[in-house]
């Protein structure tokens, strides 16, 4: 049983903590917080030992009635690996200032640059490449979504070119300080970072992405166009999606024609926090015209990367050499379809 810690018990960190706790070959030793907020309080109430990353704030936690087990540095000494879920840029700094100095393996999230970490991870696409690695970056929610559906297409047909438009949610549901509220905000930088990010996983894929923000909090959606190498049918694509791990073909005809209905479905499945770990692909959107594949998918930005973190732990700590076995083990423990 390997000892795992979470540095940054926020939107992703708290979900990874629960996912690790559901496994039988790893355990959560502790989690860290900077401020005494409801997430810190909930962590203690759930039974996680809470460590503070700013020791000078211990009195603030005491005043809030939140029990502290020690400092982040004390937690790190107890771990086989830390999952760093701190805001983008801080993780890379922690890698240099802390983890490398004490010889602690670490996983980082998609807010970090690939070059700063050295290796990027997607369980289906490059698990084997990350076996035994010391520092690995789990790519962002959007990049994870693209990799999950492009990889099976790549395998059955080959891909000449991908063009994708990312319709991104404006903020997470709990983030009251961000927007937009009544606006659509284009990301005028082209390509958006998502295309180059996919290439850190599937390096020989030709992919170009554009993105925009819209006033919703539920999910991202992707409109994807793929020029195929070989002639295949829509049934071939749908079969590939059906057989792919963590991809969920859904039907508008079953009243799953919107992100709101998909997230309601996740709640009806009894998912913790109403999470949708899989990438829903609308079956009715899958079409091939003149050798070009079109489809639409959704991405739950708060949770699709969570099982990837679990598989990355197994790869880095060499708990399982077979990526598919790790994926299936994680899926079973988390109730992933």
From Swiss-Prot:
What residues form the catalytic site here? Answer: 141
Q: Where does this one sit in the cell?
A: Cytoplasm
CDD domains found in the cross-reference section: GAPDH_II_C, GAPDH_II_N
Summarize where D-glyceraldehyde 3-phosphate binds, as residue positions.
Answer: 140-142, 194-195
Family annotation (Gene3D superfamilies) = Dihydrodipicolinate Reductase, domain 2 (3.30.360.10), NAD(P)-binding Rossmann-like Domain (3.40.50.720)
Which gene name belongs to this protein?
A: gap
Q: What is the name listed in the Swiss-Prot or TrEMBL entry for this protein?
A: Glyceraldehyde-3-phosphate dehydrogenase
* HAMAP family to which the protein is assigned, alphabetical: G3P_dehdrog_arch
- Give the pathway: Carbohydrate degradation; glycolysis; pyruvate from D-glyceraldehyde 3-phosphate: step 1/5
